[in-house]
């Protein structure tokens, strides 16, 4: 089972789901709430798959969206998951946002395709634009850029090819 990093734990930002994860010894760090009051958590890459399965078992049966971004030039890449508890006749389903930070030198995160099938195209887009490798994804390949494209266009350190170089390539 995972361990809780108690030194980085801020009780002021800890929500109900963070308390549940702590009770069940899942490693995470609360990051507060967004403008709608949705709890935001940080989970380490190596802990993400087991935490994702636990969240699914807890009732977060819908991956509303997955996206990724480059936090800072030369810094971490972040994969963001917005999860929702979909229940019958639920006017305001519970939501959570989970962020997984990875190094740009080894950007590997376990795929949650086997937990939420809707992750298929979303993880592929994050791979295509930022180069995050989703381990265990059955179809991980470029989805927007040509297979021959070099580099990851949404990284802040990406150097845009000269237009004429691209034109001459065809």
Swiss-Prot record:
Keywords: Chloroplast, Membrane, NAD, NADP, Plastid, Plastoquinone, Quinone, Thylakoid, Translocase, Transport
Location of this chain's protein in the cell: Plastid, Chloroplast thylakoid membrane
Main EC class the enzyme belongs to: translocase
One Pfam family hit: Complex1_30kDa
GO biological process: photosynthesis, light reaction
Catalytic activity line of the entry: a plastoquinone + NADH + (n+1) H(+)(in) = a plastoquinol + NAD(+) + n H(+)(out); a plastoquinone + NADPH + (n+1) H(+)(in) = a plastoquinol + NADP(+) + n H(+)(out)
Record-annotated disulphide pairs: none
UniProt keyword annotation of Membrane present: yes
Primary location group: plastid
Entry's EC annotation: 7.1.1.-
GO terms, molecular function: NADH dehydrogenase (ubiquinone) activity; quinone binding
PROSITE patterns, alphabetized: COMPLEX1_30K
Coiled-coil annotated residue ranges, if any: none
Bilayer disposition of the protein: Peripheral membrane protein
GO CC, one annotated term: chloroplast thylakoid membrane
Keyword Magnesium: no
HAMAP family assigned to the protein according to its UniProt record, in alphabetical order: NDH1_NuoC
Family of this protein: Belongs to the complex I 30 kDa subunit family.
Known function: NDH shuttles electrons from NAD(P)H:plastoquinone, via FMN and iron-sulfur (Fe-S) centers, to quinones in the photosynthetic chain and possibly in a chloroplast respiratory chain. The immediate electron acceptor for the enzyme in this species is believed to be plastoquinone. Couples the redox reaction to proton translocation, and thus conserves the redox energy in a proton gradient.
Quaternary organization: NDH is composed of at least 16 different subunits, 5 of which are encoded in the nucleus.
Protein name: NAD(P)H-quinone oxidoreductase subunit J, chloroplastic
Gene: ndhJ
């Amino acid at each position: 089972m995972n361990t809780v990093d108690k030194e980085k734990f801020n009780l002021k930002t800890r929500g109900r789901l963070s308390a549940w994860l702590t009770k069940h010894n899942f490693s995470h760090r609360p990051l507060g709430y967004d403008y709608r009051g949705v709890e935001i958590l940080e989970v380490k890459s190596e802990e993400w798959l087991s935490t994702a399965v636990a969240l699914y078992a807890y009732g977060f049966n819908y991956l509303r969206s997955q996206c990724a971004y480059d936090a800072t030039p030369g810094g971490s890449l972040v994969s963001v998951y917005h999860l929702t508890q979909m229940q019958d006749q639920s006017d305001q389903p519970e939501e959570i946002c989970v962020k997984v930070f990875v190094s740009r030198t080894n950007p590997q995160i376990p795929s949650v395709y086997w937990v939420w099938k809707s992750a298929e195209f979303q993880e592929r887009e994050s791979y295509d634009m930022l180069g995050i490798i989703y381990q265990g994804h059955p179809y991980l390949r470029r989805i927007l850029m040509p297979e021959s494209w070099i580099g990851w266009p949404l990284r802040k350190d990406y150097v845009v090819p000269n237009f004429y170089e691209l034109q001459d390539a065809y």
